[in-house]
A protein has these predicted regions:
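Signature for phosphate-centric chemistry
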Residues: 23-147, 151-321, 325-421
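Bacterial Sec-dependent N-terminal signal peptides
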Residues: 1-25
């Protein structure tokens, strides 16, 4: 090869390597805790938001997710153990694989007969949220009334009872009424009963972009580290093994169990796996360029929030309305409201992880509190707290207190036309 061509080839290879190693602008570097996604326990909350002296809280609308729980089913642990036991029988399991097998056996045993149940951590989360609400708004609980409803799911029912029992412990003069069951599904489980959404979900319109992302993003290396034979698993099988491994391990903090995820995944691998789960939540639980149906299922719930606030102003409602549902209850609602950080429109789904983060939006025990205040002039304003942190309601505004009529007009416009009062 002539010398000048060799030099050009070396230079080209050098710049090609620079290009290949350049930072991916869509890559994330979230912490291991954050990469647990919706399994992350509720964040610590120690600081109360100062309320101006001119405002008096008169009503609270609360929509909450159940607290931390055991894994919802045995599916992921079963798949991990099936793969690892087969590899072990073939003499192809690494020390890391044996360690994972032992850990997965422990998770399965710990969850036996408790799949999906609220655990002690989840109970404590609900009691903590209730206690902070009580301390922040003591006047509302002085001979006040509390109305609570929940999904029929046992973990939601138990979350409601832990919350309301804590309020009763703090002040047993509070009048409490609770309701659970399928009659609450239109508000708490609309993903089960709204026909348009159920049909859209079954159409699997969302599946092609998700599968494409998963197949190009989910790593195979973690599975290769579990098994000595590099040919034991195909790439597609390895991705599925890693996915089930990730689901088992990332769910452990919600069980109150500590786990060092860095023993099984690099930071890059963990972020890649989380981004796949995050994208699936985004595609099937929020408004996207594919469809608005996932957000529209929360229309009845949003209308209920508007109507109960109106009724409170008219003196026809309880002091506090509590609702206990699921992450799948909150994600559509927050998207429908276009709440900051909870709504993102794009045709580039590889950017979703930068702008829409499930661990910020719906950790275990996630909640939206809509607090109505009366001003010293007799007017009303409202503040929205996501996970007990105030968030602006209106686009292009950082104000956290919004006049009720202005907030009401905005929320009504979020509803489909046939539901707008």
């Amino acid at each position: 090869m002539p010398r000048n061509i060799r030099v050009i080839s070396i230079i080209f290879a050098f710049f090609a390597s620079l290009t290949a190693s350049a930072a991916d602008p869509t890559a994330t570097a979230y912490t291991a805790d954050e990469c647990c996604g919706t399994h992350i326990p509720y964040p610590e909350r120690n600081h109360d938001t100062a309320i101006p002296d001119s405002l008096t809280a008169v009503f609270i609308n609360h929509v909450g997710r159940h607290g931390a729980r055991y894994p919802s089913s045995a599916a992921n642990t079963t798949e991990v153990l099936r793969t690892l036991h087969r590899a072990d029988s073939a003499g192809a399991l690494t020390p890391s694989g044996r360690e994972l097998m032992k850990l997965t056996d422990f998770v399965a045993a710990k969850s036996h007969n408790r799949w999906g149940a609220l655990d002690s951590l989840g109970m404590a989360e609900q009691r903590g949220i209730a206690s902070r609400m009580f301390r922040a708004y003591p006047r509302l609980f002085a001979d006040g009334t509390v109305s609570a409803i929940s999904s029929y799911s046992p973990r939601c029912v138990m979350s409601m009872y832990e919350f309301t029992h804590q309020l009763d412990r703090l002040n047993n003069s509070v009048e409490l009424t609770t309701s659970s069951g399928r009659r609450n599904s239109p508000l708490m489980r609309p993903f089960d009963v709204v026909t348009e959404y159920v049909d859209w979900y079954k159409s699997r319109e969302w599946k092609a972009p998700y599968d494409m992302y998963f197949e190009t993003t989910a790593p195979t290396a973690p599975a290769r580290r579990l098994i000595t034979d590099p040919n034991y698993l195909s790439n597609s099988m390895a991705r599925e093994v890693v996915w089930n491994e990730y689901k088992v391990l990332s769910g452990m903090p919600a069980m109150g169990l500590s786990i060092d995820l860095s023993k099984y995944f690099t930071t890059e691998e963990l972020n890649a796996l989380w981004s796949c789960q995050n994208l699936q939540h985004y595609l099937v639980r929020t408004a996207t360029t594919l469809s608005s149906e996932p957000a529209l299922i929360a229309s009845e719930l949003l209308l209920n929030l508007i109507n109960t606030t109106d009724a409170a102003i008219e003196g026809k409602n309880a002091n506090i309305n509590l609702r206990f549902g699921h992450a799948e209850t909150l994600m559509p609602l927050l998207s429908l409201m276009r709440l900051r950080g909870c709504y993102y429109m794009t045709n580039y789904f590889d950017t979703v992880a930068l702008h829409w983060k499930d661990f910020d939006i719906v950790p275990m025990g996630a909640n939206l509190q809509m607090v109505l205040f009366k001003t010293d002039k007799g007017d009303y304003c409202v503040r929205f707290d996501l996970n007990e942190r105030p968030v602006p309601l209106l686009p292009n505004s950082d104000e956290i207190y919004t006049p009720w009529q202005q907030a009401r007009e905005y929320l009504v416009h979020c509803l489909p036309l046939h539901l707008q009062p």
